[in-house]
Amino acid sequence: MLTRFLGPRYRQLARNWVPTASLWGAVGAVGLVWATDWRLILDWVPYINGKFKKDD
């Protein structure tokens, strides 16, 4: 839908920048997880969530 409004030059530029933008997005996500509490993020992962059982 967006390609209908973009010209061929901008479509090619967007196609070239998608891998770079996705890589930087992944680096940013890993950096965000690293900067925050790992356990808070990993509680949402089902396999790892079982390793952090609380002793009640």
Curated annotation (Swiss-Prot):
It comes from Bos taurus (Bovine). Keywords: Electron transport, Membrane, Mitochondrion, Mitochondrion inner membrane, Respiratory chain, Transmembrane, Transmembrane helix, Transport. Its main location: mitochondrion. It is a single-pass membrane protein. Belongs to the UQCR11/QCR10 family. This is Cytochrome b-c1 complex subunit 10. GO terms for biological process: mitochondrial electron transport, ubiquinol to cytochrome c. GO terms for cellular component: mitochondrial inner membrane; respiratory chain complex III. Residues 1-12 are mitochondrial matrix. It is found in: Mitochondrion inner membrane.
